[in-house]
C-alpha cells in the first residue's frame, strides 16, 4: 500500500495490517508522500487569475484588464491582499442559524480585509432562499464570485493571505502553499494539519 502520510501508516499498523511479509521481509506499506501536493506544486506555474477577480481589481485600480498581459495579471498584487473562503458542507449550509452565523462573521471580517468567496451552487441556492426571507446575509464588503476551475483556485490559494474553508481538499492545499487556514468545521480528516 502507498500511504500519503506517517499518520496513515500508523493507522494501518494500529488496525493490525502487516508492514511486511514475515518470510521474505518484503515491505507491504510505504509512505510515498502526498500526490495531491505533487499536483498542486506542478500546476502552480500554470495557475491563472480568475477573470472575475481580474475584472474586479482592474475596476478598483482603474486599469483596463483587457490591456494587461497575462504575465502582469498573474503576478501577486501588492495591494490586493485577501482571504480566500469556501463554504459548501451540509453541516454549515443546511442549518440556517449556523449559515447565518458564518456569514455574520465573514461580513465582520470583510470590514477590515477583502474576502473572496467562490460560491458553491448549493450554498448559493441556500443563500438565495434566506435572502427571500428578508434575512440579508451578503454585504458589499464580501466579494462573491462564481465557482472557479482548478488552475484559478490554485492561483487564488497561492496569492491569498489566509484561507477559511470547510473543504477537506482546500485545507491541505493551504498547507502546501504555506497559508494559514481556519477550518470552518468541528473536525477534520486531516489531523496532520491541526
Model region roles, listed by residue range:
Residues 28, 114-115, 180:
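Residues at the starts of beta-strands that form the adenosine-phosphate
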Residues 13-14, 97-98, 128-131, 175-178, ...:
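Short amphipathic alpha-helical segments
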Residues 156-193:
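A donor-sugar binding/catalytic signature common to diverse glycosyltransferases
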Residues 48-56, 62-69, 78-159:
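Donor-nucleotide binding loops and adjacent catalytic segments primarily
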Residues 7-19, 126-127, 183-191:
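Short, glycine/polar-rich helix-capping loops at beta-to-alpha or helix-loop-helix junctions
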Residues 1-5, 12, 115-117, 163-164:
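A short beta-strand/loop micro-motif in the catalytic core of glycosyltransferases
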Residues 2-70, 80-95:
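A nucleotide-sugar donor-handling region in carbohydrate enzymes
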Residues 4, 32, 86, 118, ...:
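Generic beta-sheet signal
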